[in-house]
């Protein structure tokens, strides 16, 4: 599993998730033109994207070949709440998007700083 931390955007008064990391998307199987479904879970505060040949959505493209997933609706804010950053976890055929709370963000920042310190030592 690979993951990345992103800012939750705002577009036309709605919360927006913009995924454009080619390596992570392709590594999870989300290729340009592949279909997928979105499940918004308000109670668990998570959004699931799952590859599905009969899916309602299609992976878009940028620059002709790079995959993009753009989620922009009131459902995004409804599911993720009022957060400023999200954690995106990429698994084969499934992407999980969840909010990063202030406490979690501090832990991630400390872990990142510690890793940087170890790398320099």
What are these regions (language model features)?
Residues 9-12, 45:
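Beta-strand-rich non-transmembrane domains
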Residues 30-47, 78-99:
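A short beta-strand-loop micro-motif that forms or neighbors metal/cofactor-
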Residues 55-59, 103-109:
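Short, charged/polar, Gly/Pro-enriched secondary-structure boundary elements
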């Amino acid at each position: 599993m690979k993951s990345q931390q992103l800012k939750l955007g705002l577009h036309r008064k709605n919360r927006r998730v913009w995924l454009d990391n080619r390596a992570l998307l392709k590594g999870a199987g989300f290729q340009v033109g592949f279909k997928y479904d979105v499940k918004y879970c308000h109670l668990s505060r998570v959004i699931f994207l799952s590859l599905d040949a009969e899916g309602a959505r299609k992976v878009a493209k940028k620059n002709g070949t790079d995959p993009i997933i753009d989620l922009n609706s009131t459902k995004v804010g409804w599911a993720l709440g009022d957060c400023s950053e999200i954690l995106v976890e990429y698994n084969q055929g499934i992407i999980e998007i969840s909010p990063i709370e202030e406490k979690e963000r501090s832990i991630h920042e400390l872990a990142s700083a510690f890793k940087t310190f170890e790398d320099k030592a």
